[in-house]
Structures are given as structure tokens and as C-alpha cells.
Amino acid sequence: MPTQAANEALAILRDASQFQWYVITLLLVVIYIYASEIHQKNYRAVFAGLAFWGMDWFNEIWNALVFHFTNYAAVWMAPGKTAYLILIGLNIEISMMFAIMGVAATKLLPEDRKAKIFGINNRIFYAIVLSAACVVVEIILNAANVLVWEYWWWNAKMPLLIFLIGYLPFFLVAYWVYDMDLVEKQAAVSFGILAIDAVLLIVFAGLMEWI
């Protein structure tokens, strides 16, 4: 039987009547950030950002599938106020935030990919620090009851999986793409991740209507 939070999320899932005009402003911010990077020919930041965004979409898809198969709860849910709830744990505001975060994360990186911070490779160091910071933000959002967790192994008292699954792979993949030598490789990986996401959405949301 679905939890209260799950039912609340389902009640507004892909409900266009929830739309708010601030979404247009958020969209313009995302477009501006990517357009600025493209104008500066900083394509590695663009593809790192897209890879990061694609990684989140993959997580959101399997999270929604957890609810489908359990009929109890997704691992995380976003039942609160939103301009559009795309999936049970993903609203339009969160999605745009993730679209920006990958680009922003590259701004911390030194040019020397082998440079160390406190004896740790800078890419790994920033991936760990930023992932930990994101977990802290999620705990605050959970405390505010806008991001709901129902499982004992995924909550404020057990943050390790949130760190290891919810964020660390995103930053590691984004930095991996960022450091690739060829733009063609960066594009292939980023668009490949997004293509997989698109296929999964077509199958599970469009054809099977599971999520």
C-alpha cells in the first residue's frame, strides 16, 4: 500500500495545472549558462554538465521503478509544491538544478588534473566534498518535509548510500568526461547517457506507463 507521501506525489504527477511562470526564468538561466560556455568554446564543461544531468535522470528512473515494483514508496519522493512533477522523486526545479550543477562543479577544478589537495587527487577531492555537501542539503530538505524518505537504509541516520549512489557517481562521471582529450569522446559519452535515459523513459513511462 502506498505511503501518504507517495499518494501525494502521485496526485500531482505530470499535472500541467501545477505550472508556474518562474519555470521560464529557470529555463532561461540554464540556457544562459550553457550558451555562455559554448560561446567561450568551453565544450568540456558543457558535456560534463550534460553527463551529470544524464546521471541524475538515470537515478530518477530507477527510483520511480522502485515505487512501481513495491507499490509502497520510491527511495526518495518530492510530494511538495512544484511547478511540475516529472517523476515521483523529480520535479522541474530539481531537474534544472542538476542541469546547472555539473557545469558549476567544473569551475572548481584546477587545470592540472593530477594536482593534489590534502594528498588526494583534486578530481576525487572535489567529488567527495561536493557529494557530501549535497547530502547535507538533502538532509535539510528532508527535515523540511519537501523531500521524503521512507526506507531505513536511506535517511539522515544512514547517509552513506545517499552519498555513494545519490551523488558521488554524478561528480566522478562529470569530471571523467571533463578530462577526456577529445570533444568527440565527451559528446559520445554525454549523449550516450542521455540516449539511454530517453529509451528508458519511452519504455517505462511512455509504453508501459510504470513510472
Swiss-Prot record:
Q: Does the keyword Transmembrane apply?
A: yes
Report if keyword Cytoplasm is assigned: no
- Which key words are in the record? Cell membrane, Membrane, Transmembrane, Transmembrane helix
Q: Where are the transmembrane segments?
A: 21-38, 53-75, 82-104, 124-146, 159-178, 188-210
Please indicate which superkingdom the organism of origin belongs to. Answer: Archaea
Its localization reads: Cell membrane
Q: What is the topology of this protein in the membrane according to its UniProt annotation? A: Multi-pass membrane protein
| Disulfide bridge positions per record | none
GO CC, sorted alphabetically, is: plasma membrane
Q: Which positions carry the signal peptide feature in this UniProt record?
A: none
What is the official name of this protein in its record?
Uncharacterized protein AF_2236
